Design a protein with these regions (language model features):
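Intrinsically disordered, low-complexity Ser/Thr/Pro/Gly-rich regulatory segments
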Residues: 1-174
Length: 174
């Protein structure tokens, strides 16, 4: 079993359920450099979340939760999806990835939707899915919110100064 560590998280692989065979067949791995299936994320030796797949490239990482039926998906609460998204962001940042994506994939789902602010897609769309990565760096997100706020308020010069600060921060992160 593979184990990756980045304080305070440890990622460990687990056994693969047979119900995930369809999921693996539909998974698009053309864009990534590596994949781990069935990963348990532990924080301080306590399992906090499981992901059915983690895919990564040079600077981005994607976390996937798979449900093998719409009924199993309905049992997944919005709060839990938000927690899984938050853990994904923290793990991505801890492992040094600049951007991340978390998505829920459901076998038998009719159309894409969202739950807890996270994209939920049918399994049949997974093969053509191009991840929409977002920043794992909280400070950049906050700067984006401030830029939008001051742009709406008509404070164009201040928004431009914040944009310069954002670019400086991005260069230092590179």
């Amino acid at each position: 079993m593979i184990e990756l560590s980045s304080d305070p998280y440890v990622l460990k692989t687990r056994n693969t359920p047979l119900t995930e065979a369809d999921f693996r067949i539909h998974l698009n791995i053309n864009w990534c450099r590596g994949v781990l299936f069935n990963v348990v994320a532990m924080k301080n030796s306590i399992a906090v979340v499981e992901y059915d797949a983690i895919l990564w490239s040079e600077d981005s990482i994607m976390f996937i939760e798979y449900k093998d039926s719409p009924a199993a998906y309905k049992d997944l609460s919005s709060r839990r999806v938000q927690q899984m998204n938050s853990f994904a962001k923290n793990i991505a940042r801890g492992l040094g990835f600049k951007s991340f994506n978390f998505v829920v994939v459901v076998k038998g789902l009719e159309e894409s939707t969202s739950k807890g602010g996270v994209m939920v897609m049918p399994l049949v769309e997974l093969g053509s899915y191009q991840p929409n990565f977002v920043s794992s760096i909280t400070e950049l997100e906050y700067l984006d919110k401030m830029i939008a706020k001051y742009t709406r308020a008509g404070e164009a010069q201040f928004a431009l100064d914040l944009e310069k600060l954002r670019k400086i921060f991005e260069i230092e992160q590179a």
